[in-house]
């Protein structure tokens, strides 16, 4: 990776800064990622967390940053290449040929966090980001770089039967060799994103150019890379750091009606997340939150507060935050 730029104001406004991470070139040309940080009240704090988003996603969850600040943990977030702040005009959104493509920006982000003076680094990943950071943490050279993993509904399984995967994956690989950007004819349903945005059914405001509410094209190369990563999870990753997995207790689908829609995961099968969690490492806690949606920290207020409380208790029990801590802020307080 070439030399990184300096910290600049971020689109989230006062209190947030961003840094562009130059990552060279790939099969589409220039590649960058974006590191965002919440300016800490205590710049000498030794603990920090790095948050990595999911598919069709970017960092906008300021209330999550506020939660960690309340625990005395400096907050950083990474917009991966070809996502959100990092998407360049010549790039195909979300395209990757292997999930290992994301490892350089995670390496660079952790190095910058260490350079900022933080000795203890937590890494948190949501959905696809949860799968990516798990694979990254399992790499031999990375096992000493992370002190704990916090996974928010990690994409450990596609919910696709084995027979279907065995039939589809070879076809995908052939088509990808011919055209890396080959896409499936159907678009990903926009129902989940619309259930979050305040202009539709939700309470959150986010940039719909970076988190689409119109459905997205699923690339065959991306799906093949996801399935390859999930195979590694099933084989066992052997992560040595403690891992917390948070997910809901019930799943639905894009046809699930309101108000049930706001109390279930309509993206992933939470039972499979819970079933596969022990494959991540030797010290894994899976906590299921009743009423949680796919991103548990975007659930209804009482549910997400329970998730925050469970996370704070786990961090304290593992001596990852100070025992004396400020009560984390609720969104909207």
Where do the PLM segments sit?
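N-terminal cap/lid segment of alpha/beta-hydrolase-fold proteins
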Residues: 1-42
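Conserved alpha/beta-hydrolase
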Residues: 57-65, 69-90
């Amino acid at each position: 990776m070439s030399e990184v730029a300096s910290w600049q104001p971020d689109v989230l406004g006062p209190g947030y800064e961003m840094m562009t991470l130059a990552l060279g070139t790939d099969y589409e040309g220039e590649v960058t990622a974006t590191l965002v940080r919440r300016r800490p009240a205590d710049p000498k704090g030794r603990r920090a967390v790095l948050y990595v988003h999911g598919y069709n996603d970017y960092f906008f969850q300021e209330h999550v940053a506020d939660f960690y600040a309340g625990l005395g943990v400096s907050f950083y977030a990474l917009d991966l290449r070809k996502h959100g702040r990092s998407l360049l005009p010549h790039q195909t959104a979300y395209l990757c040929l292997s999930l290992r493509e994301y490892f350089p920006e995670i390496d660079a982000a952790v190095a910058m966090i260490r350079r900022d003076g933080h000795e203890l680094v937590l890494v948190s990943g949501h959905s696809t980001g949860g799968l990516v950071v798990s694979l990254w943490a399992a790499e031999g050279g990375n096992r000493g770089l992370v002190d704990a993993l916090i996974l928010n509904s990690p994409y450990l399984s596609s919910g696709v039967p084995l027979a279907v995967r065995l039939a589809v994956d070879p076809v995908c690989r052939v088509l990808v060799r011919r055209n890396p950007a080959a896409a499936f004819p159907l678009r990903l349903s926009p129902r989940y994103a619309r259930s979050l945005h305040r202009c539709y059914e939700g309470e959150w405001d986010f940039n719909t150019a970076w988190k689409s509410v119109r459905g997205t094209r699923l690339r065959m190369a991306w799906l093949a890379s996801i399935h390859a990563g999930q195979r590694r999870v099933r084989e066992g990753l052997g992560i040595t750091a403690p891992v917390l997995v948070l997910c809901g207790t019930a799943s639905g689908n894009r046809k699930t009606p309101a108000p049930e829609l706001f109390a279930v995961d309509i993206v992933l099968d939470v039972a499979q997340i819970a079933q596969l969690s022990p494959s991540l490492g030797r010290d894994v806690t899976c906590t299921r939150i009743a009423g949680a949606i796919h991103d548990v920290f975007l659930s209804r207020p009482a549910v997400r507060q329970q998730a925050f409380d469970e996370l704070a208790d786990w961090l304290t029990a593992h001596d990852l935050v100070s025992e004396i801590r400020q009560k984390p802020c609720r969104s909207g307080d």
